[in-house]
């Protein structure tokens, strides 16, 4: 299954720990109003799981992605929730 996992925390938080395979794109990148290069060629129906520490930043990023036409956004809340979700999917 094709999916993208985005950790929306700051670089230092991502560097401490993150979900395997996640890419780090902070909300400030999305605040420019443009889609980051990492997502430029991503099909709009690709599953995109976003997470942060508490779900607030990931919720904001999810809303921005929806405004850009992405249709399969999952707010994974935090690293632990995403890890659990991925383990259950196996």
Functional labels for PLM-detected ranges:
Residues 2-4, 8-49, 53-90:
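Rhodanese-like catalytic fold shared by cysteine-dependent sulfurtransferases
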């Amino acid at each position: 299954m094709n999916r993208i996992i985005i950790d929306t925390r700051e670089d230092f938080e991502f560097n401490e720990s993150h979900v395997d395979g996640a890419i780090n794109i902070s909300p400030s990148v999305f605040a420019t109003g443009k889609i980051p290069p990492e997502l430029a060629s991503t099909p709009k129906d690709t599953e995109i799981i976003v997470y942060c520490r508490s779900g607030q930043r990931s919720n904001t990023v999810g809303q921005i992605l929806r405004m850009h036409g992405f249709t399969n956004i999952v707010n994974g809340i935090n690293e632990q929730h995403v890890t659990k979700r991925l383990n259950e999917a196996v």
